[in-house]
Amino acid sequence: MQTLVDEETGPFISDAIHYGLMRYKNEFGHRDLGYPFLDLYSEYSQREVGMMANYRNTHSSFRGSTLQNELGGAHYFLFIDLHKDEDIEESINYKDKFVNQKQFQWESPNSTKVDSDRGRDLAQNKVNGKTIHLFVRKYKTVNNVTQRYTYIGRANAISYRNEKPIEIQYQLENKMPIDLYQEFEPEKLVF
């Protein structure tokens, strides 16, 4: 506490706090992003999302495709790699893709059954009061550098099929900008 009132270091600390607040205001403005404080189409790591969602375990423990918020379990965070490694096993080569700017097809992990609690939450999220957040990246790594995920926003299941894995069609709450859509799905022409 003495450092905060110290005549030499106090002004430096005050300047650093002021700078941080001004930088935040310039980047995000005064808008309320709402829980879990995610900015649409911004990039995040799984660790950052875990911290913003108040995930209680160590942030390396939720590696994989889903992270369920522990505070009431009302939010699911899906982390998706669109392009898998060429040597990936067929059993985990999920058929995840953007159908169009408003729809995404996602396959659950092989361990998720349609009649399990998690399966029902993912395939019937609105009925079960669950919120689905989609995070997508083209590749896991580029030049040995782990890539960040782009937050696509909230999504709601509109249909599902198969017992295990479950293929779910999600309707995006926000239509993706055309440039971002074509970055993720360059082979699909949009007129």
Could you describe each region identified by the protein language model?
Residues 1, 22, 51-52, 88, ...:
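Detector for methionine-enriched segments
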Residues 1-37:
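C-terminal helical accessory/scaffold domains
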Residues 141-191:
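Compact mixed alphabeta submodule
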Residues 13-25, 78, 106, 122, ...:
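Generic hydrophobic, helix-prone segments enriched in Leu/Val/Ile
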Residues 35-148:
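Acidic, glycine-rich low-complexity segments with interspersed aromatic residues
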